[in-house]
Regions:
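Conserved SAM-binding loop
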Residues: 70, 499, 524
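The feature marks cytosolic C-terminal regulatory regions of anion transporters and related permeases
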Residues: 357-513, 517-518, 536, 542-543
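Residues within alpha-helical segments
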Residues: 265, 269, 308, 507, ...
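Short, contiguous clusters of charged residues that form electrostatic/catalytic patches at enzyme active sites
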Residues: 23, 181, 185, 448, ...
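Transmembrane helical cores of multi-pass ion-transport proteins
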Residues: 1-413, 514
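Generic hydrophobic alpha-helical segments
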Residues: 81, 162, 450-454, 531, ...
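Short acidic-hydrophobic, aromatic-tinged amphipathic segments that line or gate anion-handling sites
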Residues: 518-534
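Short secondary-structure capping/turn micro-motifs that flank functional sites
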Residues: 326, 506-507, 526
Length: 543
């Protein structure tokens, strides 16, 4: 890390600092309303989102593996954090966040960052779209100004609450929501350099204060005053009993945070022609999530939209991310008394737009049109995210993807019998020597097919079975088990297996399972011709 910063400082100039300063301020302006919105949607007071934005934002910029990454609370976390708050409470959310930070650090230390990239795209698109639907529909109540609603962890229960309380809709809330929605759609075309969410909050707050004060819920009426001071340091209640019940939620936060941050880093790489360090990024995210709860902040991760904005506004180094965090803190200290007047209804369109933008609509539609195994994985993951939980959806989605991949790989394995004439075997020995070429990995998805084909061959009762395995890169434990059965059955009928061209990796697998010794070292050959000559000589001698 010291080397990274020394290299950055070495070529740093005032011109670059001015660019980083501008980019950091612009991203900070965008981050402020989003941080409050995400916190409220997660079931906690808005200041906890702001604390997360500046603490995690600064730490990830210093310690992370991508020099353009902007971290903070994100929309993807909303359903997960809301579920934890409803089930365990805010204090336990801090504990779960800190535990997730430790897990992220361990993932980075043990270099799991490269493995996270192998999570199938249909799984990530499925749960991201599911989260988007949950966020969007979760804001309908605030958009309409419904009162008396209880929050639930279940999507269906929340939709039922909306239905039961539709008659409590507030005209002023709907009016404010519509004004903010219009601002979000119109202002980016008129003033693209100024963040539309900030303009929307300023305009709607001014309208509400001037024309109908006290007619609709505000941040102040719902959550009280926002402290205009630096957040106090407080260590969460990390007792064994507390941590043991929060292992599951912490793991979900860590996995989702790791995936989101690495996706954001990949986007930054594509925009800047740079290359991030996946494992260092996870460590940076981990440190941020360990420290942030000590200041009351909610879990954070890399934010794709804010990272892209940082780059588009001329950021040249990690300094822009640090400035973004400092700007958010200064804004909190100065503007907290004003922020309490922001209508809750003005937050709803901002979150709805976030949900719309994160839904990956085009990719979702493309995978649906494929009508393949990927389509099934996508639909199952999406539905489980909405109607069950993110934990269940990712587990089932990954399991289904692995099963379908194994099936596809298993069917792609080739087992081809070579005719004796083509192998130049003496005519009188044709029936006593069978030769098979095997292509593809011998793993659990292909092991049974391999066994079935070979068993058919040995029922003809050849004396020697030559397996050409030069194109077999790996043999897993399941395939070893089936191989044992083949060798055992063939030995019973007095036959001998000869193996040719075996790779070093596959050979180590057979040695570890004991198969290498059972078959006998003298029955392994580099070339098929050598195995044929061995079999012919043995048969001619009457062996």
């Amino acid at each position: 890390m010291k080397k990274v910063w020394l290299n950055s400082v070495k070529d740093y100039t005032w011109a670059r600092f001015r660019k980083d300063l501008l980019a950091g301020i612009i991203v900070g302006i965008i981050a402020l309303p989003l941080a409050m919105s995400f916190a409220i949607a997660s079931g906690v007071s808005p200041e906890y989102g702001i604390y997360s934005s500046f603490v995690a934002g600064i730490i990830v910029s210093i310690f992370g593996g991508s020099k353009f990454q902007i971290a903070g609370p994100t929309g993807a976390f909303i359903p997960v954090l809301l579920g934890i708050v409803l089930t365990y409470g805010y204090q336990d959310l801090l504990v779960a966040g800190m535990m997730a930070g430790v897990l992220l650090c361990l993932m980075g230390i043990f270099k799991i960052g490269t493995l996270i990239k192998f999570i199938p795209r249909p799984v990530t698109i499925g749960f991201t779209a599911g989260i988007a639907v949950t966020i969007f529909m979760g804001q309908v109540g605030n958009f309409l100004g419904l009162t008396g609603m209880e929050k639930h962890e279940s999507f269906v229960a929340n939709m039922n609450e909306i239905w039961l309380h539709l008659d409590s809709w507030n005209f002023y809330s709907v009016f404010i929501s519509c004004i903010c929605m219009l601002v979000l759609f119109i202002f980016p075309k008129i003033l693209p350099r100024i963040p539309a969410p900030l303009i929307g909050l300023v305009i709607t707050t001014a309208i509400a204060m001037l024309f109908f004060p006290d007619a609709l819920p505000t941040i102040g009426s719902a959550y009280g005053d926002i402290p205009s001071t630096f957040p106090p340091f407080e260590f969460p209640d990390m007792t064994f009993a507390n941590m043991s019940k929060l292992i599951g939620p912490a793991f979900v936060i860590a996995m989702l945070g790791g995936i989101e941050s690495l996706l954001s880093a990949v986007v930054a790489d594509g925009m800047t022609n740079t290359k991030h360090n996946s494992n260092r990024e996870l460590i940076g995210q981990g440190i941020a999530n360990i420290v942030t709860p000590m200041f009351g902040g909610i879990p954070a991760t890399g934010a794709i939209a804010r990272t892209a904005t940082n780059i588009n506004n001329g950021a040249t180094s990690r300094v822009s991310g640090v400035i973004h965090g400092i700007f958010v803190l200064l804004t909190l200290l100065v503007l907290a008394p004003v922020a309490v007047n922001i209508p809750i209804a003005a937050m709803a369109p901002i979150l709805m737009l976030v949900a719309w933008n994160m839904s990956e609509r085009k990719t979702f539609q493309h995978i649906i049109k494929l009508k393949s195994g990927d389509t099934l994985v996508l639909i199952i993951t999406f539905l489980l995210t909405v109607f069950a939980s993110l934990t269940v959806s990712v587990e089932v989605g990954l399991l289904l993807a692995v099963v379908l991949f194994a099936k596809q790989m298993g069917s792609s394995m080739q087992i081809e019998e070579i005719e004796p004439e083509g192998a130049e075997i003496a005519p009188h020995l044709h029936e006593k020597i069978s030769i098979f070429t095997i292509r593809g990995p011998l793993f659990f998805g292909a092991a049974q097919i391999f066994q079935q084909n070979i068993i058919k061959a040995i029922h003809v009762k050849p004396k020697y079975l030559i397996l050409r395995m030069g194109k077999v890169p790996i043999i897993d434990a399941t395939a070893e088990g089936y191989f044992h059965q083949i060798e055992k059955e063939f030995s019973k009928q007095g036959g001998q297996i000869l193996i040719t061209g075996l790779t070093d990796k596959a050979k180590e697998s057979l040695k570890g399972s004991g198969l290498y010794d059972r078959i006998g070292e003298e029955h392994f050959f580099s070339h098929t011709e050598d195995a044929i000559h061995y079999a012919e000589n043995a048969l001619n001698k009457g062996d």
